[in-house]
Amino acid sequence: MSGVADTTHAPRLPDPLRLGRVHLTVSTLDGSIAFYQRALGLQLHDRDGRVATMGAGGEDLLVLVEEPGAAPGGRHAGLFHYALLFETRRQLARAVKRLASTQTRIEGASDHGVSESIYLRDPDDNGIELYADRPREQWPPSRIPGERVEIFTLALDMEDLMREVDGEQPRARAGAGIVVGHLHLHVGDVEQGLAFYRGVLGFEVMVNLGTAAMVSAGGYHHHLGFNVWLGSDVKPRPPQTAGLREWTVLLASREELAVVRARIAATGLYVRADHGGFVVRDPWETAVAFRVR
């Protein structure tokens, strides 16, 4: 990351912080809209040519940008998965019931200690996680010095989860209150990822597994994960490839936005003004937008 100052001990990002819209490249907009409506119960909020926004009736969650003929994601940096956070365990169970009723393939189901998660993919192979958090006081503390929580992976007790919706019929639409909870990225080097996301942007390290790390603001288990599971030499996402175009960090005020922007710019990183906020890129050209919520 040449030209960027060493800011290993950069000030932390302000709390409260949460994530906003996830921008995805898709190959066929009509097909993607149909998938997200049918499988996830999302609503089409707006469509303008080859761009559509979708959500659960409140704020936009996804911005889908059509690039006809875009190839599925392959072995490159970028999206591992984005994660939609449900307000309650019952809402997550309703989402699973909808997936079953629409015969949507579930790739995995995991108990992470801090949360319960369902994994699937959209038609362009973009990874999706649907999850519900356990109460914060139930999050397992880490036994490793310097780490905040323990995030493990066990098989999810699906039978117990589905007891939440015994007797209910599948619901065509997702309930309100869904937000983007976190993202997980493929990167080429975890330490370089930490130098950027902790040292430049100001996230706090929650977990460091060597081949993967998880960072957050305000003590959340993670707003972002990144890993080298595709290899340590992955390159940026090629043009005309489906995947992540941009993800969004939402700050509480314009004053906070200005402070964070000035601090990041002082490291020498290029900061581009955009729609009342700003955008920066990580070492693998993944775009991160900062805006006021």
Regions from the PLM with identified roles:
Residues 1-30, 81-84, 135-191, 244-247:
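N-terminal beta-strand motif that seeds the catalytic metal site of vicinal oxygen chelate
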Residues 1-69, 76-84, 97:
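An N-terminus-focused feature that recognizes amino-terminal "leader" regions
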Residues 3, 16-20, 24-30, 83-127, ...:
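Vicinal oxygen chelate
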Residues 18, 48, 78, 114, ...:
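Exposed loop/turn and edge beta-strand positions of beta-sandwich/beta-sheet ligand-binding modules
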Residues 36, 172-216:
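Conserved small-residue-rich
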Residues 39-45, 199-205, 265, 269:
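Conserved acetyl-CoA-binding loop of GNAT-fold acetyltransferases
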Residues 43-77, 127-134, 204-242, 283, ...:
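Conserved short beta-strand elements that form part of the metal-binding/catalytic scaffold
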Residues 50-134, 138-145:
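Active-site-adjacent scaffolding segments
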